[in-house]
Swiss-Prot record:
<protein>
    <recommendedName>
        <fullName>Neurotoxin BmK AGP-SYPU1</fullName>
    </recommendedName>
</protein>
<dbReference type="InterPro" id="IPR002061">
    <property type="entry name" value="Scorpion_toxinL/defensin"/>
</dbReference>
<dbReference type="InterPro" id="IPR003614">
    <property type="entry name" value="Scorpion_toxin-like"/>
</dbReference>
<keyword id="KW-0872">Ion channel impairing toxin</keyword>
<keyword id="KW-0738">Voltage-gated sodium channel impairing toxin</keyword>
<feature type="domain" description="LCN-type CS-alpha/beta">
    <location>
        <begin position="2"/>
        <end position="64"/>
    </location>
</feature>
<dbReference type="InterPro" id="IPR036574">
    <property type="entry name" value="Scorpion_toxin-like_sf"/>
</dbReference>
<feature type="disulfide bond">
    <location>
        <begin position="12"/>
        <end position="63"/>
    </location>
</feature>
<dbReference type="InterPro" id="IPR044062">
    <property type="entry name" value="LCN-type_CS_alpha_beta_dom"/>
</dbReference>
<dbReference type="InterPro" id="IPR018218">
    <property type="entry name" value="Scorpion_toxinL"/>
</dbReference>
<dbReference type="GO" id="GO:0044741">
    <property type="term" value="P:venom-mediated suppression of sensory perception of pain in another organism"/>
</dbReference>
<dbReference type="GO" id="GO:0006952">
    <property type="term" value="P:defense response"/>
</dbReference>
<comment type="function">
    <text>Alpha toxins bind voltage-independently at site-3 of sodium channels (Nav) and inhibit the inactivation of the activated channels, thereby blocking neuronal transmission. This toxin has a strong analgesic effect when administered to mice by intraperitoneal injection.</text>
</comment>
<dbReference type="GO" id="GO:0019871">
    <property type="term" value="F:sodium channel inhibitor activity"/>
</dbReference>
<feature type="disulfide bond">
    <location>
        <begin position="16"/>
        <end position="36"/>
    </location>
</feature>
<keyword id="KW-1015">Disulfide bond</keyword>
<dbReference type="Pfam" id="PF00537">
    <property type="entry name" value="Toxin_3"/>
</dbReference>
Length: 66
């Protein structure tokens, strides 16, 4: 696993305000835990700890939300 911003489709982060939202999102996806990283590179976004390698993470480049 890896520590990273979990990504939605099209390389977009999950925006957040509360740690419990991110912890739930991350653990549902197999991570050990997660929290809301405030005022980071992508604003307030969910950061996961030990997220499985098969789950999408935010990579450099644009968020292509449709």
């Amino acid at each position: 696993g890896r520590d990273a911003y979990i990504a939605q489709n099209y390389n977009c982060v999950y925006h957040c305000f509360r740690d419990d939202y991110c912890n739930g999102l991350c653990t549902e996806n197999g991570a050990d835990s997660g929290y809301c990283y405030l005022a980071g590179k992508y604003g307030h976004a969910c950061w996961c700890i030990n997220l499985p390698d098969d789950k999408p993470i935010r990579i450099p480049g644009k968020c292509h939300r449709r």
